[in-house]
Amino acid sequence: MTVVIFLSVLLGAILLGVPVAFALLICGVALMLHLDLFDAQILAQQIVSGADSFSLMAIPFFILAGEVMNEGGLSKRIIDLPMKLVGHKRGGLGFVAILAAMIMASLSGSAVADTAAVAAMLLPMMKTTGYPLDRSAGLIGTAGIIAPIIPPSIPFIVFGVASGVSITKLFLAGIFPGIMMGLCLALLWWWQAKRLNLMTFSKATKQELCISFKNSIWALLLPVIIIGGFRSGIFTPTEAGAVATAYALVVSLFVYRELKVKDLYKVFLAAAKTTAVVMFLVAAANVTGWLITVAELPIMLTELLEPLIAHPTTLLLVIMLAVFIIGMVMDLTPTVLILTPVLMPLIEEAEIDPVYFGVLFILNTSIGLITPPVGNVLNVITGVSKLPFDQAAKGVFPYLIMMIMLLLAFVFVPELILVPLQWIS
């Protein structure tokens, strides 16, 4: 009965158009009434404690760093360097999009923000040079979902806080899978570009390449500082967010000089709005997560799937299928917040590496960002490209299949994630 109430209230509220955070609170109140636990003071305490975590402080810092980079010219220079490197090849703008998305992923950790930035800069150029708009939009959208995998990743921070898994290990574990995603996209785009009569650009001279590298070096140093810093123990992932923000501000204000002091209010306001949405969602989900634990739903799920515990690969396939279906209709962050407390006891019982599972889980929920009918990233590229939703979904489809195949490869061959993690660590 508890499961029925949980699902019916949550899904009913979402279908009625209630924002997810408020839907989670309504669901939490319904569960408290059902379990005869309702107390306004306890409800308030759970909401406050949900956002009361030192690790969560990284989220506003990385969001602010992303806003500063977009306004301060770092994003523009990041795209210019791949343009000079591979823009002259057949289908070069596609490779530029992939490279730019990977570099920007290592700066902000937000799929929606990275996709919007890359699409706004490259899609008009791809359209005027004769690239198929649906495939181009699909490629950029899929490249955008690399952001939650390559550190610094906001979804990894959320998962780490919800599960108790080391955020530093999650960050390091995401590096190789993120690179693999980029390589697979580049391979598929190369195969597609061979069959298309696409316009090519003149090859950049060594002087132009040097100038572009010189202009972008300050932006490229940021991921090196962040990853090198928390890997060597100089600072934690949370402190890395503050370092990223400070670095982006200094470079934008005093090196590139594209960000003016008068623009800071607008930048901070945009970051504050985005942060408020995410943190309220985290706080609301804590109420539901607490009640899920009190109602012993994780124990019930463990008992239900007990025959599969001895077969970790089969268990992971079942979980990944369920997460994929849920990810089709729910955004990444609420999916992570709702399912993590339910799934982690099962993962521990099956003795599956929690860091490995975290990478699979976030990759799967990231795929949901480009999967109809919801797909937030899919909506972004639809808006930027002005394509009908069905055409954008058609453009994403081959890359979506590629990402699903890569996810399955990681499920069947855990060493693809665990061995590089050992090397990096």
Where are the language model's segments positioned?
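Alpha-helical transmembrane segments of multi-pass membrane transport proteins
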Residues: 1-425
